[in-house]
Curated annotation (Swiss-Prot):
Protein name: Arginine--tRNA ligase
Highest taxon above the source species: Bacteria
Record's catalysed reaction(s): tRNA(Arg) + L-arginine + ATP = L-arginyl-tRNA(Arg) + AMP + diphosphate
UniProt keyword Membrane present: no
Known partners and oligomeric status: Monomer.
Intervals of motif 'HIGH' region: 125-135
Location(s), subcellular: Cytoplasm
Database matches in Pfam families: Arg_tRNA_synt_N, DALR_1, tRNA-synt_1d
Amino acid sequence: MVIEQQITGAIIAGIKELYGADVTASQVQLQKTKKEFKGHLTLVVFPFLRMSKKSPEQTAQEIGEYLLRNEPAVAEFNVIKGFLNLTVACSCWIDLLNSINEQPAYGIIPVTEQSPLVMIEYSSPNTNKPLHLGHVRNNLLGYSLSKIIKANGNQIVKTNIVNDRGIHICKSMLAWQKWGNGATPESTGKKGDHLIGDFYVLFSNKLKEETHALEAKGLTKEEAEAQSTLMAEAREMLRKWEAGDKEVRALWEMMNNWVYAGFNETYKMMGVDFDKIYYESQTYLEGKGKVMEGLEKGIFYRREDGSVWADLTKDGLDEKLLLRADGTSVYMTQDIGTAKLRFDDYPINKMIYVVGNEQNYHFQVLSILLDKLGFEFGKGLVHFSYGMVELPEGKMKSREGTVVDADDLMAEMISTAREISQELGKLDEMTPEEAENIARIVGLGSLKYFILKVDPRKNMTFNPKESIDFNGNTGPFIQYTYARIRSVLRKAAEQGIVLPEQLPLTFAISEKEENLIQMIADYAEIVKEAGKLYSPACVANYIYDLVKEYNQFYHDFSILREENPELKNFRLVLSANVAKIVKSGMDLLGIEVPERM
């Protein structure tokens, strides 16, 4: 904050004048004063005792008196033991608000052509089923993180790797071929991803029937699966796909295209997008090539059965399979290939993978392998590891068809938001189109905020009922406060009030108003911290705290009814800047805020 920098400079000058010692800004420990004490900023004086050769209280007293004489930003001070509590002058807070008011994008660092380029991968769906609740957390985290990293002055490429090949895809294809009767999204009235997901579940159920029948004849579960004709057919279909069989490839393309159309609808409703999409079917051969290159260079080794491995024991890990004995690739091989293609396509300075914490070991290994293969970005890749998400009813499974689909969840959230908003009268005097738009904004905002306010590294339970509440740490509470501020500003405009670009520095404001200005000013640091920690939760919880503080201010003070015109203008400018920061912060979370509600 500018005020802190100003006072820090004065403290450095004071230490020099009082004690003849040179100190740096990093040695000046200036922090927010605790709520139980009077003041805005507190200086810890203990580091200066060896220079002053006096008691903590006397040293604090001398520095306080120096600041009072020489720094206009300091209005008064008090000393508690070794702590110097400073009260900042009213005029400084108003001046700080003027400065923030001049900056439409306060707290956001502009991106230039010279800015570092960060690629962030998220979503990574399989084309055998719709996106589910786990994907929702992944997409929301990835999209928000891309906005936060961009707000920290980086160029961003949002990317997605679609897992469009493999045995799981062949299971859906085989089920459609055997029992689909030519079903299409058009003939069934279903989204393509849901239709294909149904066939994946159907295959799983048919496989269970077959293996249970074999187990009834005395076979073990493992023996039954090994003798399954369905699994044999699925493996044969995969072999044909890899061999480029025209019929299998045509079926694969048709069914995948149905899925992509469905995914696009889901992404659009969720409000996330991508700059570049990669497909595993295009990258796995690249990975094989890099592995063979590593084998030739002696980085990897081949076992007697023909499989290729990396020995990572010297790196504190184990041995890692890279190519099976039959020459087929594993996930690690594909990730190596995808990384190569990406760095061929873009001059990437940093690569971030948004993938659940069950893959921690995988990315630890990938980082080492890429480094061994000579990729400069290997050591610096970031695995943004996040926890699992569940509903109150328990975990999600996709094979049994009990998965919580993202589409169903979003539709339910919008429907619930519509009902609650109607009950509370928040849709009164709106056209049906406006009311539906508010239901969408509130429903999706509830979902996004509830997920993003949680520390991403923690497992969480998503509670739909809790998330749609117009009170407490929720999206609707923040959205409603924003709409309330916009309503105040509209009424001011209707009364002919034109907000000044610069407020005079000559009037007194309350402590609560000073606190609000301080909170607004903190936004720039919050954005930096969120980028540093890869945590949208930093932004979410800051916005909630800001809105909570504003609501208390709104309750305690008159705005439009204030008789003093200077104070009225000040409170309107203060309100406008709270709204500006709320909108900016919610945008970093990918959440819309309504102008009226």
